[in-house]
Amino acid sequence: MSWQDYVDNQLLASQCVTKACIAGHDGNIWAQSSGFEVTKEELSKLISGFDQQDGLTSNGVTLAGQRYIYLSGTDRVVRAKLGRSGVHCMKTTQAVIVSIYEDPVQPQQAASVVEKLGDYLITCGY
């Protein structure tokens, strides 16, 4: 399965995620949904935020030019929200899964889809 297949068939097909991308820890995008124009700089800031959440707390999470309010996170997961949209991201051994979800999808629904894929990638060494 290609990286694009993971985005299309695992994340978007769940209908719990409306936009998504998978990138390496260097910020290079491996696959992304159509119209989700997240930049390498935005991804780099997000990735550094997994280890140092202070930057996300003060500056929020910016994806595709949209700034989201940082809600919570760990060294593996980052959550953010803006109005009716939410962000759920997961860091694996070599990759970061970034997802956007929209109302009426609940945060737990998006989290379940993203983390299931993330856990699978970890078992595969990614």
UniProtKB/Swiss-Prot annotation:
The keyword Cytoplasm applies. InterPro entries: PFN (IPR048278), PFN_euk (IPR005455), PFN_sf (IPR036140), Profilin_CS (IPR027310). GO terms for cellular component: cell cortex; cytoplasm; cytoskeleton; neuron projection; perinuclear region of cytoplasm. GO terms for molecular function: actin monomer binding. Disruption phenotype: RNAi-mediated knockdown in the neurons of adult males significantly reduces survival to 27 percent. Adult survival begins to decrease from approximately day 9 post eclosion. Pan-neuronal or glutamatergic neuron-specific RNAi-mediated knockdown decreases adult climbing behavior. Glutamatergic neuron-specific RNAi-mediated knockdown also decreases activity throughout the day (during both light and dark cycles). CDD domains: PROF. The keyword Cytoplasm applies. Its main location: cytoplasm. Keywords: Actin-binding, Cytoplasm, Cytoskeleton. Expressed in ovary and head. Binds to actin and affects the structure of the cytoskeleton. At high concentrations, profilin prevents the polymerization of actin, whereas it enhances it at low concentrations. By binding to PIP2, it may inhibit the formation of IP3 and DG. This profilin is required for intercellular cytoplasm transport during Drosophila oogenesis. Function in neurons is essential for adult survival, and is important for climbing behavior and activity. Occurs in many kinds of cells as a complex with monomeric actin in a 1:1 ratio. This is Profilin. It comes from Drosophila melanogaster (Fruit fly).
